[in-house]
């Protein structure tokens, strides 16, 4: 069981995550959002696994998450998601991220 994780809710933690994610060749990605209290769903959490660490990114902490853009659009990095439609839609809508080389376990 993987117990190596980092809560990303400060600029310092975001910098640590960015340094590791730049070197990753495979990312496991999931998002959590709240659509119960909001007319338009609100992204709350982004979880990214890059061996050997899981990054739990607080999307409500108002961090600069631009460091995610490069690995998400990289053709050389495999992004593994399950039922990726909403995850991709929210990340594109809220951050303008582009995605390439996606493996959706639901399809």
State the predicted function of each range.
Residues 33, 61, 107:
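Short, glycine/acidic-enriched loop or turn micro-motifs at the edges of active sites
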Residues 54, 74-79:
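Short active-site oxyanion
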Residues 1-27, 31:
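N-terminal accessory regions of nucleic-acid-interacting proteins
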Residues 1-5, 49-57:
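Short, basic, glycine/proline-bearing loop/turn elements
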Residues 48-51, 86-107:
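Metal-dependent phosphoesterase core characteristic of DEDDh/y 3'-5' exonuclease domains
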């Amino acid at each position: 069981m993987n117990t190596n994780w980092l809560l990303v809710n400060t600029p310092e933690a975001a910098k640590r995550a960015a340094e590791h994610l730049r070197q990753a060749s495979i990312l496991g990605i999931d998002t959590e959002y709240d659509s119960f209290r909001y007319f338009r769903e609100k992204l709350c959490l982004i979880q990214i696994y890059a061996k050997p660490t899981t990054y739990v990114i607080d999307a409500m902490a108002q961090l600069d998450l631009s460091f995610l853009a490069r690995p998400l659009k990289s053709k050389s990095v495999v992004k593994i998601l399950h039922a990726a439609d909403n995850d991709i839609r929210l990340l594109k809508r809220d951050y303008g991220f582009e995605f390439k080389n996606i493996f959706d376990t639901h399809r």
